[in-house]
Structures are given as C-alpha cells and as structure tokens.
Design a protein with these regions (language model features):
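Thiamine diphosphate
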Residues: 1-232, 236-238, 242, 251, ...
C-alpha cells in the first residue's frame, strides 16, 4: 500500500488486508467483527460531552458607570483576569487555560497572562493547531478559552470548530474584531459571517454583547457554563448602554440569561431589533424617531441562535419588525427572526438591515455608513417600513 495513492479513503481488501493486519500485529477477524457491530449502531449516534465537573469561582461582576466609554474586549479581558486571580493556584479549582496566537495585547488576554502565567499558553501563529489543542484540553479536566480575531478564530478554523462540536468539547472562543467595526483593517479582516457559521453546527452557543457591562457578565457566565460557547465583539470603544433615566441598562441587578432578549426602550410603533454594538446606533435612531412622533419598541438580541419567543410575540403585536446588525444580512439576525416568524405563521411587515457586500477600509463609522447602516439610514428605513 505504501506510495500507492489509490488507498486514500479506501480500505484494503483480500490479501492486502490480511498482510496489513499481520504487519500491524492485529487479527484479521477485527474487520468482520466491526461490520457486525455496525448493524447494531442506532440511526442517530449521540454526542457525549467531555466528562468532568467545573469547579471555578467567577466572582462579582465589575460595574461600568454611565459615564464610561471602553471597548467590549477590554471588559472581557478584565473579567477574565478577575476569574484567573480568584482560582489560580487554589486547590480543588478547575484550571482555566487561556490560549493565544500572538495577539494577547489586541484581544486583551495579556493581563491574565501576567497574573496566571502557568495557565497562559502562547501558541504562536498556529490557529488550526490551537483550535484543536484547546478543544482537546477542555476534555482533560480544564476549562479552555481561546481569544482571537473573528476571521482567525472561526473563519480560518471552521472545520476544527465543527469537530469540537462533534466531539462535545468544553471550549470558550472569544472573537474580537468582528464585523465592519474593524474599519481600517478592511474586508479581509472584517468577520461578517460568524453567526451563520455557528448556526451550521448543533451545539455551539453564541453571545454578542451590547456593552462592557453585558460583556463582563457574559464572560463570567461562559467560563462557568459547560459546553462550547462563543463570545463575539468588535474593536471600537462603546458608551455604557443606559435606560431612559440614564442608569446603566445592565446594572448591578442584571444577570445574563442565555437566549433572553433585552428591552432597551419601550414603544408600540413597530419594533427595532439590534444585535451587539449596533444597539448604540439604534438608541440614537430611536431618539430621532421619538422626536418625530414615532415611538418604536427597541430590543437588543445578544443570542441570535436562540429565539426569545415572548419578546418576539410582543414585537409582532407592534405591527412591524426591523432587524439591525453588523453581520451578513442573509445569515445573521435577520434570517433567524424571519425564519422563526415563518415557522410561527406570523404576518407582519419585516425588513432586515445588515451587511450586503464586502466592506471598505476606513473608520468604523465611515465603513458602516457606506454600507447604509448609519443611525440616519436606520431612521429612514424604519419610516419606509411603517409606510408599507
């Protein structure tokens, strides 16, 4: 069989099989036994998640005030370092291994690296290997977390993450620099398809937090929750999201709940559903619409792979739904909401606003505006939807 390409993906038979098994030191009867066992395999083979109980302290959430403006990746890094310090060297605590591919400063895992050096694994520019090693490590009694740019941590290594799903690993992937928000890095580095890629799997959970406060809580939740979980966030600094009274929306009493939509502003003249950092432009558009006598309901969806049925029902009752996202409009939030509406048999005016081509290179605001996704574009499109 050596040096014969015919055997790529093809099993040896007859005398070739007998010789191969003898050379390997196995009985040739194993082949027949395997064929018999196949007859007994159920139609659906269950996935068995990696064994083990997570014993890790995630601590109290940091609180970012209404006057704070910072990036979600820094909030993630701060929360990660907090958790590391609470557990590093503590007997009986599940180790938290953090993997990096030469980007610790950009993805904000450098603080963790300084505080917990033995738990920090620098892999170099080896994304495929890192996805595999981090997934495998999570089945060995540790919590694995890998932070990288969106195009490297998911687009580049999609098959490895698909195999992590098949193998039931316990990996936490944090994607920074996603969407058009990356701006100057241009179309090659603007990850605009992460929700669609993870929707192709059956076990991955996805969280796209709105601001630093929600990012902090989602990070701590992901670390202590079994299973494969992805957090996705942009690069830009964001204001803390507030309620109508000016208090942080995700304040001290807020607890992250996977799949729960966030009510940002009350209203009844249609519903605007935002994902991730776009909710900040959504608030600006909402204020403009209210000044013009239109008061829509404003929602934020941080978990686009999981529908909040109660929130969707309330949105339908307003008579019009517009989704707003920094993501491929055909595979992200819009498609998720539209499919669920169709499955429920709902009749409602609907429009999806999202990325519809590869982006340009420039400031985040300029690139988003050139895609027709500015807050002014949102106001205009929403008014057109109501007029239909």
């Amino acid at each position: 069989m050596e040096n014969v390409p015919d055997y790529h993906g093809k099993a040896a038979t007859g005398q070739a099989y007998e010789r191969a098994m003898a050379e390997l030191g196995f009985s040739s009867s194993l082949g027949g036994e395997a064929m018999e066992r196949r007859k007994e395999v159920p139609a659906t083979v269950p996935i068995h998640p990696c064994p083990g109980t997570i014993s890790i302290e995630t601590g109290a959430a940091r609180q970012y005030g209404a006057d704070v403006k910072t990036d979600n990746r820094s909030a993630f890094g701060n929360a990660l370092e907090d958790v590391g310090k609470l557990n590093y060297g503590e007997l009986g605590k599940t180790p938290l291994l953090v993997f990096d591919c030469d980007l610790a400063g950009s993805v904000k895992t450098d603080g963790f690296a300084r505080s917990c050096p033995k738990w920090f694994k620098e892999m170099g520019i080896q994304e495929h290997s890192t996805a595999t090693v981090a997934g495998a490590a999570s089945c060995g009694g540790v919590v694995s977390l890998w932070a990288d740019f969106g195009v490297f941590g998911l687009d580049e290594v999609y098959n490895q993450q698909r195999l992590n799903d098949i193998n039931g690993t316990n990996l936490k992937v944090v994607l920074t620099h996603v969407g058009l928000d990356v701006g100057e890095d241009g179309m090659t580095h603007q990850c605009i398809d992460y929700a669609g890629l993870l929707r192709n799997t059956f076990g991955w959970k996805l969280v796209v937090p709105a601001d630093p406060n929600q990012t902090d809580r989602a990070t701590r939740w992901a670390i202590r929750t079994p299973g494969n979980i992805c957090l996705a966030m942009g690069r830009s600094k964001l204001p803390v999201l507030t309620d109508e009274k000016g208090a942080p929306l995700f304040g001290e009493d807020y607890k992250f709940q996977y799949g729960k939509a966030d009510l940002v502003r009350e209203g009844s003249h249609g519903t605007i559903i935002c994902m991730g950092h776009m909710v900040h432009r959504g608030v600006k558009a909402w204020e403009t619409l209210v000044a013009q006598g239109i008061r829509p309901r404003l929602l934020h969806v941080s978990c686009p792979l999981e529908t909040d049925e109660e929130a969707l029902e309330a949105a339908v009752r307003t008579g019009a739904i517009l989704t707003y996202e920094d993501h491929h409009s055909g595979t992200g939030l819009a498609s998720s909401i539209a499919m669920r509406l169709a499955e429920r048999g709902e009749t409602v005016r609907f429009k999806g606003m999202g990325v519809h081509r590869y982006g340009d290179s420039g400031t985040s605001d300029d690139v988003i505006a050139r895609m027709g996704l500015s807050s002014a574009d949102l106001v205009m499109t929403f008014k057109q939807l109501l007029a239909r």
